[in-house]
């Protein structure tokens, strides 16, 4: 009887620790301070699609990953899942502010209000994304609007690698999800001369499909590059092709 009691006591003591061991590690997450749309957004399904030891997706610790001779990554880049169906651009700006320790009290709501349409639900154009950096203040930006000549001659995969080596994330808008903003935070050449096997690592505010909602995603670099367009989502003057922003704090 004493042995049974002892085992029950041990089990009771260990149960909380077992639960902690199975809980997802969210050290990479920026805390939520607002919910733009409680009924939807990627945050509304937070971790519900996770599958530990998924046979289909590798689950790597991108948050603590460090650069190597082939990989360039922004170690400890934090992520957040967007709290509405339309605020991927707003969330991407938020994550960049966090990276540079410039987030302060800003959240999706305060940043979205800086767009010329305010927080009216709707996709964020390149111009509106820049408006948020301007509204926060203290940032220099280089974007598709600033490129002279053909954008593809400036925004190359080499440009991505070199920008990351400078510690600068790259905000990109392309046709993922039919139109989506993400932030490039890593690039691996895989140690070969060809770019065919290169991969990019992104901070993704709608990371619901890879069985680990940590806010990171991986894409074949060339496949991303040849799909780097919003198509005709925005008016022509707003730009749709190879839309990007490199924002850095002013010195």
Name the predicted role of every residue range:
Residues 149-205:
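Active-site-adjacent substructure of cysteine-protease-like catalytic cores
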Residues 83-87, 94-95, 102-104, 116-125, ...:
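Solvent-exposed loop/turn segments at secondary-structure junctions
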Residues 14-20:
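C-terminal segment of classical bacterial N-terminal signal peptides
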Residues 1-4:
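Positively charged n-region of N-terminal signal peptides that target proteins for export
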Residues 85, 89-97, 108, 126-130, ...:
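Extracytoplasmic/secreted envelope proteins and their assembly/folding machinery
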Residues 22-123, 197, 231-236, 247-251:
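Active-site-adjacent structural segments surrounding the nucleophilic cysteine of cysteine proteases
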């Amino acid at each position: 009887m004493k042995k049974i009691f002892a085992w029950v006591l041990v089990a009771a003591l260990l149960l909380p620790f077992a639960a902690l061991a199975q809980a997802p590690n969210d050290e990479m997450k920026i805390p939520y301070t607002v919910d733009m749309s409680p009924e939807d957004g990627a945050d509304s399904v937070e971790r519900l699609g996770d599958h530990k030891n998924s046979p289909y997706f590798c689950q790597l610790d991108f948050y603590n990953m460090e650069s190597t001779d082939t990989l360039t990554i922004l170690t400890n880049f934090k992520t957040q899942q967007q709290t509405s169906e339309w605020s991927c651009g707003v969330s991407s700006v938020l994550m960049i502010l966090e990276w540079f320790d410039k987030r302060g009290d800003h959240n999706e709501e305060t940043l979205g209000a800086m767009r010329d349409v305010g927080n009216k639900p709707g996709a964020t154009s390149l111009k509106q994304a820049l408006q948020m950096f301007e509204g926060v203040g203290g940032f220099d930006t280089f974007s598709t609007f600033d490129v002279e000549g053909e954008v593809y001659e400036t925004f190359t995969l080499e440009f991505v690698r070199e920008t990351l080596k400078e510690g600068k994330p790259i905000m990109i808008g392309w046709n993922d999800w039919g139109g989506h903003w993400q932030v490039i935070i890593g690039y691996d050449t895989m140690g070969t001369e060809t770019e065919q096997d290169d991969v990019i690592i992104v901070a993704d505010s709608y990371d619901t499909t890879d069985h680990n909602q940590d806010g990171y995603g991986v894409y074949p670099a060339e496949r991303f590059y040849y799909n780097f367009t919003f198509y005709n989502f925005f008016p022509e003057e707003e730009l749709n092709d190879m839309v990007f922003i490199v924002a850095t704090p002013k010195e």
